């Protein structure tokens, strides 16, 4: 007998193996609290910290943005912790970091290390998925991805 699979839907996108797909947790923060700054003009947040004598100060923490909605950003959970307070730029308003969400994606390795990229799945079967290409925070044609997401950790150097 021969197994035959008929695909009746026509989806255009990037074909990736299901073994490369991973779900990752992020902090969700309001857009008003994210700013550009630091030495490299990258995105980040102003985190409230305390000096040894108990004085409150604010430090710029650079963070990657992995997705956005109309009012919020999904930011990396490596630099912030639950319970941290972030301060709105040019204001004294504070926001407690606690809201979390997850995104489906793959580990992108164009720069030599595993970097999470969100994907939008258009079609999926047991072996592979068709994902939307050229999205703002996602994959493009000719991007290198990790084939088995269970074998790497975020920001791990990848040796060919």
Language model: regions and residue ranges:
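Edge-of-domain interaction segments
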Residues: 1-116, 120-160
